[in-house]
């Protein structure tokens, strides 16, 4: 599993540690990734994703996982999230046709 946020795309960055005597050594800046289970109202099950703290705030700001996935173009989503979105659209369309 890569160290990349599924929502924002934040990944590993590189830079330097700089000592008091100005000696530079290479280092990596890792994103604050957490594995989260967000409850989907349409699917009636949790969706597990690896999100950065900023990505989690983005999803919540957009109204939850359902609203986020349905409003985001599929091109901007990861392969796993596209599959979840397809399932959501299928269930939403079936419910709309039944009503």
Curated annotation (Swiss-Prot):
Quote the gene name from the UniProt entry. Answer: rpmB
Q: Give the family from UniProt.
A: Belongs to the bacterial ribosomal protein bL28 family.
Q: Which GO terms describe its biological process?
A: translation
One Gene Ontology term, aspect cellular component = ribonucleoprotein complex
User: Which keywords does the record carry?
Assistant: Ribonucleoprotein, Ribosomal protein
Q: What is this protein called?
A: Large ribosomal subunit protein bL28
Task: Name the SUPFAM superfamilies on file.
Answer: L28p-like
Please list which residues make up the signal peptide: none
Name a GO molecular-function annotation: structural constituent of ribosome
Show the taxonomic lineage: Bacteria, Pseudomonadati, Pseudomonadota, Alphaproteobacteria, Rhodospirillales
Q: Name one Pfam family in it.
A: Ribosomal_L28
